[in-house]
Amino acid sequence: MEVGIDSFAGLREGEYDGSKAICELIDRIQFADQMGLHTFGIGEHHRKEFLDSSPFNILSAAAAKTKNIKLASAVTVLSASDPVRTFQSLATLDLISNGRAEMVAGRGSFSEAFPLFGFDFKDYDELFIEKLNLLLDIRENEFVNWSGKFRPAIDNLPIYPRPIQNPVPIWLGVGGTPQSFARAGAMGLPLMVAIIGGNTHRFRPLIDIYRQAGKEAGHSP
């Protein structure tokens, strides 16, 4: 079993010193490493009260001050991101941290990232599926041939840098819909469940859906 922390780079009410808040977050990650925790994840937001629009940048700074702890984006709002740049950021973090990078891909809990980056929120699910497939293609292949609906095609182009870990861990972050659990299982991706209040027992049937979908797709438990 591994024990870790998922956190945000938030500004407390009445606090306006963003530099101080980020430095304190990096200090907390360093302390978690010293205490022997296994992972530390940072979420992504594009709101006034958060400073974590670029979790990989914060995690890269933390990588320089830690030795063992795994560093994860949790979650990266993949629906509103470019999978090429996302993979490059993940791979760069993996190089800086000497193989400690992980990523949790999610659709996001807030909508502001979509208009900010030129996407329509009504394409929420379709964007995520297309971009997740491209991200996994990039992870598996140095040279990529790809075409889709929401991004220009990639015609046998190499994507660098490549990470130390092969494959670099990519998790799927899900909320409470059976479809999301089934998708993660069918794709053979590890699962991060966002439990925001309520009774945790309600997630057991969803975990069963995840495991059954993985089994039917031929993936190991």
What are these regions (language model features)?
Residues V3-S7, F40-I42, L71-S73, A101-A105, ...:
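Hydrophobic faces of well-ordered beta-strands that scaffold small-molecule active sites
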Residues E15-S19, L51-S53, P83-V84, L116-G118, ...:
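Short, solvent-exposed loop/turn segments at secondary-structure boundaries
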Residues M1-K70, N166-V168:
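N-terminal beta1-alpha1-beta2 module of alpha/beta enzyme domains
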Residues L51-I58, G198-Q212:
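Active-site-adjacent beta->alpha loops and helix N-cap segments on the catalytic face
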